[in-house]
């Protein structure tokens, strides 16, 4: 039974899970946006909001609690000088989780977690510039077919090809293009 379960287990033992979340909170403070799996992002949201709430108190106890939690001490000044002031009037909800599709290798759901009110490039522009493939959805009488268009070359790959064969084919095309240019 799952009564009273407060945190997802994430397939790890408790000490490994807590260390992973501490490390991810530290990286989130440093970069203000990270990409991870959806389950980890949801678990991380709770911890990241808790650390910001502790930092907003700005007491000696809050400094020692944050100092013992964060894995890299170089991010502590950013937390107390920048993030604490940014979220001073906000009562909660310091992070947002944005879904980012599926990972190609194992099809696990991915997500971005970021602090709200940040100065980063908006995520729509960020994804559009860094995506290698565009997904083309084509409805057919048999069902919906998904094709992948490579943005650099404009070539379209059918979803009937397995992922492994698609990557082998991409490697072959790269070899052909380098050999033809020589």
UniProtKB/Swiss-Prot annotation:
A single GO molecular-function term is: structural constituent of ribosome
Q: Which UniProt keywords apply?
A: Mitochondrion, Ribonucleoprotein, Ribosomal protein, Transit peptide
Q: Would I find Ribosomal protein among this entry's keywords?
A: yes
Q: Name one Pfam family in it.
A: Ribosomal_L17
Record's keyword annotation contains Zinc: no
GO cellular component terms?
mitochondrial large ribosomal subunit
The secretion signal range is none
Which InterPro entries does this UniProt record tie to the protein? Ribosomal_bL17, Ribosomal_bL17_CS, Ribosomal_bL17_sf
Spell out the subcellular localization from the entry: Mitochondrion
Q: Which GO terms describe its biological process?
A: translation
Where is the major localization of this protein?
A: mitochondrion
Family, as annotated? Belongs to the bacterial ribosomal protein bL17 family.
The name this protein goes by in its record:
Large ribosomal subunit protein bL17m
């Amino acid at each position: 039974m799952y009564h009273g379960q407060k945190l997802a287990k994430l397939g790890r033992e408790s000490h490994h899970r807590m260390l992973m979340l501490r490390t991810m909170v530290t990286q989130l403070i440093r970069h203000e946006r990270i990409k991870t799996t959806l389950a980890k992002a949801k678990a991380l949201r709770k911890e990241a909001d808790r650390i910001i709430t502790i930092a907003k108190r700005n007491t000696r106890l809050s400094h020692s609690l944050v100092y013992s939690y964060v894995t890299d001490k170089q991010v502590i000044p950013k937390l107390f000088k920048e993030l604490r002031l940014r979220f001073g009037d906000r009562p909660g909800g310091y992070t947002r989780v944005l879904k980012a599709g599926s990972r190609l290798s194992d099809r696990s759901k991915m997500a971005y977690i970021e602090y709200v009110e940040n100065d980063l490039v908006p995520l729509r522009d960020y994804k559009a510039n860094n995506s290698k493939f565009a997904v083309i959805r084509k409805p057919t009488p048999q069902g919906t077919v998904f094709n992948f268009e490579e943005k650099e070359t404009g070539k379209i790959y059918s979803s009937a090809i397995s992922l492994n064969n698609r990557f082998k084919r991409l490697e072959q095309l790269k070899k052909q293009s380098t050999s033809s240019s020589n």
